[in-house]
């Protein structure tokens, strides 16, 4: 089922008549030597896609891959946004689609 916004044309989105959107929120931070730094994003996005495939009219918004992870500052290459920037990204994302669909977050 074609429901991933970033893989669709504007025409396909319009024809799909989406009424709901799910946004996965992850991170890119250290999880030890055995798990990818992006596992939070990968799991949240996979679940979002599985949910959307089961719910009529649900669109999958591209994942938000970096969030507030200041508690991982001591680990190399853990990416973080400031708290205020994280809130601003979430707010702006919501504002972009709020008038068109019901929004569901998955983290």
Question: Can you describe what each PLM-predicted range is?
Answer:
Residues 1-103:
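N-terminal catalytic or cofactor-binding beta/alpha core of small enzyme domains
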């Amino acid at each position: 089922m074609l429901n991933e916004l970033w893989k669709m044309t504007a025409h396909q989105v319009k024809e799909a008549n989406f009424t709901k959107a799910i946004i996965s929120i992850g991170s890119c931070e250290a999880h030890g030597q055995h798990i990818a730094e992006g596992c939070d994003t990968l799991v949240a996005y996979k679940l979002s896609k599985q949910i959307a495939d089961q719910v009529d009219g649900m669109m999958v918004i591209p994942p938000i891959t970096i969030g507030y992870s200041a508690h991982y500052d001591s680990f190399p290459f853990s990416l973080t946004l400031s708290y205020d920037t994280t809130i601003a990204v979430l707010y702006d994302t919501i504002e972009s689609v709020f008038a068109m669909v019901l929004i569901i977050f998955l983290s």
